Structure formats: C-alpha cells, structure tokens
Curated annotation (Swiss-Prot):
Role noted for this protein: Catalytic subunit of the slx1-slx4 structure-specific endonuclease that resolves DNA secondary structures generated during DNA repair and recombination. Has endonuclease activity towards branched DNA substrates, introducing single-strand cuts in duplex DNA close to junctions with ss-DNA.
InterPro entries: GIY-YIG_endonuc, GIY-YIG_endonuc_sf, Slx1, SLX1_C, SLX1_endonuclease, Znf_RING/FYVE/PHD
Encoding gene (name): slx1
Keywords: DNA damage, DNA recombination, DNA repair, Endonuclease, Hydrolase, Metal-binding, Nuclease, Nucleus, Zinc, Zinc-finger
GO biological process, any: double-strand break repair via homologous recombination
Positions of the GIY-YIG domain: 14-96
Family: Belongs to the SLX1 family.
Molecular-function annotations in GO: 5'-flap endonuclease activity; crossover junction DNA endonuclease activity; zinc ion binding
Enzyme class: hydrolase
Organism: Aspergillus fumigatus (strain CBS 144.89 / FGSC A1163 / CEA10) (Neosartorya fumigata)
Pfam families from the UniProt entry: GIY-YIG, SLX1_C
Descriptive protein name: Structure-specific endonuclease subunit slx1
Record EC number: 3.1.-.-
Amino acid sequence: MDDTQIEHPRPIPIFYCCYLLRSTVRHASLYIGSTPNPARRLIQHNGVVKGGARRTAAEKLRPWEMVLVVEGFMSRLAALQFEWAWQNPWYSRHLRSEESSALAEVKHRRMRKAKSEDPEFLDSNCDSAKSRVKGTPKKSKRRHRPPRSLDTYFSDLHRLLRSTYFSHWPLKIRFFSGDIYQSWKAWYDRVDVRLRSPVKVILDGSCPEISAHAGGNDTRFGGVENAKITYAAIRDYIEKAIFLLDDPKDVRCHVCQGQIVPTEELTTVCPQAECHCTCHLLCLSRKFVDAALEPNQIVPKHGICPACEATIEWPLMMKELSFRSRAKQELLEILKRKRRVDRKQGAVTGEVESSSRRTVSVDLDDRFGQHAEDEFLLDEDWWEGLAAESDSDTDLRLKPLSKAAPKLETVIEDSECDDADIL
C-alpha cells in the first residue's frame, strides 16, 4: 500500500472574497484578486511578508490599499470565476451583451452571404490563407489590454452582479474606503439599470456607519487589518448542532415530521441560539425555494425557520453543515471527549451538561485557534488547503495534524496574467 495521502472534500470556506486594490501613490493603478484572508493578502502585496503578486511588487506604487471586497463566495472556484470575469470583461461570457451577440451574428451572416454569391471572394481568401501557410509563421503577440478607469471597474462589477449567472449568488459588497464608496454611490445613482436583486452593501473601514446598510450577521471589521475570519465565528453554532445530533433518538424533521438519522442523512440545524429546529437538507431547501417564488432559483439564499420563524441565511447553514460532515477528525475528537465526560459524571445531569459544554468549548477553541488567529489562518493543518489564495496559485497540501505547514516564502505569479492597470 503506498503512502499517498487521500484528500477529502474540505469544508466550505468561512470567508472568500474578490478584492480591488488601489495604489496610494497613484490612484489610477488598480488591481483585482481574490483571497480567503484579506488582512494577510494585503501585507503580502505590500511586501511586508513574502508571497505577494508580481504586478504589485513595484516599490513606486506601494503601499496598496484594499478599497472594496465582494464577499459571499461558497468556494475558491466560485471566487476564481468571478475574479476572472471581472479581470477580463472583454472575454467573459457573463458580460457579453445581447446587442454585441446580435451584431456578431449579423456579421457572420453577411460573411456567409458574400462567400456564396462571389466565388472570387472565396478564391482570394483561399489564396491569402495559402500564402500565410507558406510564409513565415506569425509570431503570437502578447495581448495588451486597454487601461480601465475606476468607473469602468464599477461598470463591470455592476454588470457581473446583475448577470444571469452571478445574480443568484449570495454576494455582498464591503467598502473599506470612504471616497471609493462615495464614487460608487455617485456612479450608481447615474445608472438606469438596477441590480436584479438588492445586493447588500456593507460600509467598513473609513466609511461612515449607516445603520441602514448593516445586517444582523454583517459586522464591521473596522479595517482590512482586522479582516481575519475563521470558523471560530460560528463556534457556538457548531457546538449546538453537535449536541443536538449526538443523540438522534428524538431528532425529527420540522418540515416532513420524519425521523432523522444524522449519520446517514444530511441534516440542517437552525443557527438561532435558542432554536432546536432540525430538518432534512432537501426538505428545508425545497421549502425555501418554494417560498422564494423565483422560477429560476435552484439553491435558496435565505428562508424562514419552520420552528422559530426567524429569517436564516442558507450559506451560513451550509458552512456549518459542511464542517460537521467533512471535518470528521475534529468532530470525532470533540465527541469522544464529550462522551468520556458523560460517563464519568452521568450521575449529576446538570454538572454533565455544564462540564461537557465547557470541555467542548475548550476543544473547539484549540481547533479554531481563538488565541492564535494568525497561526490558525496561516499554518493550521486542514484549513490551509481550504484557505489557499487564488492569486497565490500554489497548491498547499495538507500536513499531518501534529505539524504546522510552512509559511509562504515565494513571490507568487499573478492570477491576473499581468493585467493590473499600471499607469
């Protein structure tokens, strides 16, 4: 038997975003990337630690600032898709307007008609093709993309967010720069076409606090340097789900009223602290989709809990479910500790509950790196594979749980393929 390590599916990233960088020296210089850790990625771009992108390495443009992020991606691949489309609006199928498609079709029809009606046209094209074959092979030239202004970036972002593909994703825009937000607001007020569904805007960093833009789960980081998001953010939610499903005797689906077997079925748990609602994944998703009344919707964005009637976000439940179903080793250690405590103190019910809760909390704190967030984000075992940078473009493999992965030491090639707008 070989020693090849089998990689299992990772939990859904607790946070992944596409970001827009701006040079503080030359505001016209902009850069697009994606990352699960904005705080770390920014200091890499600024050369504080190794691992930055080549196109942001010019000292004359440093320091860079992260002015806005688009967050809410459920996987690294999803963020990469959005990042590439934002970087390459000329080639992205998501930004091809119906008008340009119609013009291309008309041009194609005219070409076919000219070929069919004029034989000389066809012969001349054949001769030119032969001459190209016989001649010196044409050297491929590197495509130089036209520089884009800030308004152009806004326009491309706006078109992406209202495209058929991305408009159904639970995406949010978080602004860290007050003047960039004001520029966006002034630009958006001039646009005739609105987004298909309201995209939540979160004002952070130097932006003024406006309660209308704040949501229950959309906390302000206070700045990019504080944007270090780990699974510790939903620790209590994960603990509650583990306790509810550890003894499945009385676990029933609140939608179909059927018995739930957590070890065999994907089970959702309400994130509200006082609610013990459990449902089959398919039952709850069908209920949410039916209530949304959107014909093209397949995956729900949010819905009303059938027990407590609170509005709950579907992505949040999926993050907890993916951790519970995919981080098997962590859960086994937590449950083993809990059951040992239950056996030792089974005579005193109240003490059992309190001690188990405290033990699990300590264990989760260790796993989530509550007291060492930087080490957790950079080096923690299974998470590092999940938190690989899109623009780092290096496949970081999982290490044994007892060892820490080495820190990034190489300068990383651009995920943008050298298309940062350096003016």
